[in-house]
Amino acid sequence: MFRLYPNCSLPSHRPLVFLPRLPSRSLRCRAAADIPLGDGIRLPREADSTSDTARSRDVSVAAGGNGEGAKWRKRRLLWSKSGESYLVDDGDALPLPMTYPDTSPVSPDVIDRRLQCDPVVEDCREVVYEWTGKCRSCQGSGTVSYYKKRGKEVICKCIPCQGIGYVQKITSRTDIEVMEDLDNEPS
């Protein structure tokens, strides 16, 4: 039996204290065994930590194997923080619309008539040029990158071109000889 103050030679009126002999690690684990650390991770209890099967069970729970951790693991797998976009699963590119919704493209003879139109004789509609050019957001690559608050780079699919790299461009300017000149102009 151990007294509370073994070096004291005076008789004590305090009762003797019996302390169980435990390793320091298990004493700390016992004190925090019922407190969850977050996201389904729990420290092993003293009775569980003695056997190897209990240790493997605790590791599987900590990794999200069963119970409360399963929901966390599922959520973690659905949205991984590897820097990939949730649009990365698309196998094929979406079709690129060349006209506005619910309209049909202008035929070449209509464009020729508009070009030959004389504004003195008739009311002429302006010629509208449509072409496909590189996306300005992703520079034709289909992916863009941005940085989060803490400086971590995130790469995802370009939204304006839907990951294709090219977009429909339209203008009513008449001083254009080559449509690609517009792509090379500084903005």
Swiss-Prot record:
Cellular component annotations (GO), alphabetically ordered: chloroplast; chloroplast thylakoid membrane
Molecular-function GO term, any one: protein disulfide isomerase activity
Residues covered by region (Disordered): 41-67
Region feature (CR-type-like): 113-175
One GO-annotated biological process of the protein: chloroplast organization
Subcellular location(s) per record: Plastid, Chloroplast thylakoid membrane
This enzyme's EC code(s): 5.3.4.1
Superkingdom, taxonomy of origin: Eukaryota
Keyword terms: Chloroplast, Isomerase, Membrane, Metal-binding, Plastid, Repeat, Thylakoid, Transit peptide, Zinc
Cofactor(s) recorded in Swiss-Prot or TrEMBL: Zn(2+)
Organ and tissue specificity: Expressed in roots, rosette and cauline leaves, stems, inflorescences and young siliques of light-grown plants, but not in etiolated seedlings or in senescing tissues.
CXXCXGXG motif repeats (start-end): 135-142, 158-165
Listed Basic and acidic residues bias regions: 42-58
Coarse class of the protein's main subcellular location: plastid
UniProt membrane topology term: Peripheral membrane protein
Mutant phenotype after disruption: Albino cotyledons but normal green true leaves.
Transit peptide stretch: 1-30
Catalyzed reaction equations: Catalyzes the rearrangement of -S-S- bonds in proteins
PANTHER family assigned: PROTEIN DISULFIDE-ISOMERASE SCO2 (PTHR36035:SF1)
Miscellaneous notes: Its sequence is related to the DnaJ family but lacks the J domain. The CR-type-like region is similar to CR-type zinc-fingers.
Function: Protein disulfide-isomerase involved in chloroplast development in cotyledons. Involved in the process of vesicle-derived thylakoid formation, probably at the level of the integration and folding of LHCB proteins at the initial location of integration. Acts only in germinating seeds after dormancy, during the transition from heterotrophic to autotrophic growth.
Assembly with partners or alone: Homomer. Interacts with LHCB1 proteins, but is not part of the signal recognition particle protein targeting pathway.
Protein name: Protein disulfide-isomerase SCO2
Organism, as annotated: Arabidopsis thaliana (Mouse-ear cress)
